């Protein structure tokens, strides 16, 4: 209870596989029939499950698992922040570093230092973003889903991190 882990499911209501896609099926459904959703979830004390993020979005910084959603949820409490996405970017020393991409409320201004201090004042030091980027929009697909892998690719270019250790971006 109260620990994040991958949400898996098995039962008569779970698909047997992807149509004519054996590789995708093998990646999603293990030999015991468990569907690996790719979602991070936490079981509450009452026995309910709460989705807390996506495994592929998890940042591993110096061996620490950092859940972007936790930092995003906190940054939404900043009065100047309209929208935020937290991503992992490659880093030679730690493997990955935290980057917060922030859309400010109309008419607001802020600084990287202000955002970092706000996080440092309320969260563990290892959760403070190394990079803060103020943007006007996030890349999205036709269905309106935010494309974090596109954000990672753009960040690598913008920060000139091509030589840092490679991370999976999709």
Identify the function of each model-found stretch.
Residues 1-5, 13-16, 26-34, 159-165:
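Conserved ATP-binding loop and adjacent catalytic segment of the adenylate-forming AMP-binding
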Residues 5, 10-11, 16-17, 24, ...:
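AMP-binding/adenylate-forming catalytic core of the ANL superfamily
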Residues 35-37, 133:
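Short, small/polar residue-rich loop motifs at catalytic or cofactor-binding pockets
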Residues 123-145, 162-170:
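AMP-binding/adenylate-forming catalytic domain of the ANL superfamily
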């Amino acid at each position: 209870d109260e620990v994040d882990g991958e949400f898996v499911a098995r039962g008569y209501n779970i698909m047997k596989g992807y149509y004519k896609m054996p590789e995708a099926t093998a990646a999603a459904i293990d030999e015991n029939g468990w569907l690996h959703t790719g979602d991070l979830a936490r079981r509450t004390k009452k026995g309910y499950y709460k989705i807390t993020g996506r495994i592929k979005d998890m940042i591993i910084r110096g061996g620490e698992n950092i859940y972007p959603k936790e930092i995003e949820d906190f940054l939404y409490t900043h009065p100047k922040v309209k929208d935020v996405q937290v991503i992992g970017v490659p880093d030679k020393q730690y493997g990955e570093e935290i980057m917060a991409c922030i859309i400010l409320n109309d008419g607001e201004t802020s600084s990287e230092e202000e955002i970092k201090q706000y996080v440092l004042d309320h969260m563990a030091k290892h959760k403070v973003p190394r990079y803060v980027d103020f943007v006007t929009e996030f890349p999205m697909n036709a269905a309106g889903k935010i494309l974090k892998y596109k954000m990672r690719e753009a960040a690598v270019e913008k920060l000139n991190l091509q030589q840092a250790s490679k991370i999976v971006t999709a």
